[in-house]
Every structure is written in C-alpha cells, then in structure tokens.
Amino acid sequence: MRDLNIRWLGKLPYSEAYDLQLGLHRSVSQEDSKDDYLLLLEHNNVITSGRSSKENNLLVSKDQLHELGIEYFETDRGGDITYHGDGQLIGYPIIRLSDPKKVIPFVRNLENVIIDSLRKFKIDSFTKEDDTGVWTPKGKIASVGIKVSKWTTYHGFSLNIFDSLDGYQLINPCGNQSEQITSIHEFNPNISFEAVSYTHLTLPTNREV
C-alpha cells in the first residue's frame, strides 16, 4: 500500500516547482519507495509549452511576454501550450503507477477528481473522448498534461478559479484557436480559492490519482 502525501505550497515560481517535482520524482521512482505526492500550488504568470506544442500557437513574441511580466518555459510534459497565473489551482501528482501502460486511466482519474470537485460547487462539467481536460457548457475550465518516466508521473493539472484569464488571449489554448476558456467565478464569484483548494486536499485520497 502506497501513501499519498498532499502538500500545499502556496504561490511558487514555475522553475522552483519544476525542480521540486524532479527531486520528488527521483525519490518516488525508486522501487522501494512507498510514498506518492500531490503538490497543490499557484504559479506566477507563466506560459508553458508541451511536447506537442507548435510555435504558431504562441501569438506574441517572447520579448513581448517579458514586457508583460510573463515567463515562458518549454517543458517535457504532454500536450500543447497553456497559461498559468493568478487565481488558478495547480496540481502536480508525483505517483508511481502499478503499470506504466495505465497512463490513460491515470489521466481520466485526474479529470474525474476535478469533475468531483466542481460538482461540490454545483458546477456541471464533462470530459471529451478525443481530448484531455475538463469542460463546462461555458468552456474549458481545466487542463491536464503529464509525463511518465520510470513508471512515475509528474506535471499534472490546472483549474481556473478566478476569472483573470487575460493570459489565454496570448495563445491558442492547447493548440485550439476556437477554445473558449472559463473559470469557477463565471459560475459563482463567491467561491474562494481556499475552498476549492481544500476540496482537492481531501478528494484525491479516495481515488487512484
């Protein structure tokens, strides 16, 4: 039986969170390890591109991003380009899979954890068979992109809570020009960041995420 250790890290720059993931990944991927981790945090404004990212999905230059105070990182996760920033809950599960072929079920479980969380706030959401993430009738509300190495996952998901989504105007989110992006606050502006974070602190222990 493996133990899931859930850590709330507050606001953390992307580079620091990435280094922390790599350190935990080295530990979790050891055959005698019994501990998995779920890191919950918030990032400073940053745009990240995944292994499937195309250059034209970044709609401004990197110099313009710098002028706007937005960092840019090329990453080794799956997926295309996305934005992280204020009011967005980030979850990084560093978990050793029982079978490295179970990547797709792992991603589906992550999506279901988010759907369960949104349901607690009376927000209906759903997945798409040919895509990853979570959608609502108003648009996409959460993104998922992971990497598996040595049977162990890292990277993870982002869930939009506040409606400060200006950064998405600088990209084609996940490579989709027509993608509509929404947030929890577009359904109920009274839901706090802390309330959503607490929900994720408790839900994953009941699932194989």
Regions found by a protein language model. Name each.
Residues 1-141, 190:
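N-terminal lobe of the biotin/lipoate ligase/transferase fold
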Residues 58-64, 141-165:
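Short, conserved beta-strand/beta-arch hydrophobic-aromatic motifs that form part
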Residues 91-93, 132, 144-146, 157-161, ...:
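A structural signal for short, well-ordered beta-strand segments
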Residues 162, 166-198:
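A hydrophobic, small-residue-rich beta->alpha segment in the mid-to-C-terminal subdomain
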Residues 199-205:
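Conserved small/polar residues in nucleotide/adenosyl-binding loops
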Residues 123-128, 154-155, 166-171:
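Short conserved catalytic/interaction loops centered on acidic-Pro-aromatic/His motifs
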